[in-house]
């Protein structure tokens, strides 16, 4: 994800982030299935999706911590 996209994600609501996270997890599942069957055209996409999942989880956790501290 680009820095601009990350800033937009930080402005999103937790529900939107959770929805995006679920979509990315489903995409990762499909990519792994394609990899196993030898149909995956772009193996780097797996890495990109994993990184996006980690970034969204980090943003969600930061918001949890921020809410707890207040």
UniProtKB/Swiss-Prot annotation:
Highest taxon above the source species: Bacteria
Signal peptide feature range: none
PROSITE patterns noted in UniProt: RIBOSOMAL_L29 (PS00579)
Gene Ontology CC: one annotated term: cytosolic large ribosomal subunit
InterPro entries in UniProt: Ribosomal_protein_uL29, Ribosomal_uL29, Ribosomal_uL29_CS, Ribosomal_uL29_sf
Molecular-function annotations in GO: structural constituent of ribosome
Pfam families: Ribosomal_L29
GO biological process: translation
Keywords of this entry: Ribonucleoprotein, Ribosomal protein
Annotated HAMAP family: Ribosomal_uL29
Entry's family note: Belongs to the universal ribosomal protein uL29 family.
Record's protein name: Large ribosomal subunit protein uL29
């Amino acid at each position: 994800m680009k820095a601009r996209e990350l800033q937009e994600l930080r402005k999103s609501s937790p529900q939107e982030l959770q929805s995006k996270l679920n979509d990315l997890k489903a995409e990762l599942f499909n990519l792994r299935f394609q990899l196993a069957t030898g149909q995956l055209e772009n193996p780097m996409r797996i890495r990109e999706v994993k990184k996006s999942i980690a970034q969204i989880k980090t943003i969600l956790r930061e918001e949890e911590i921020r809410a707890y501290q207040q």
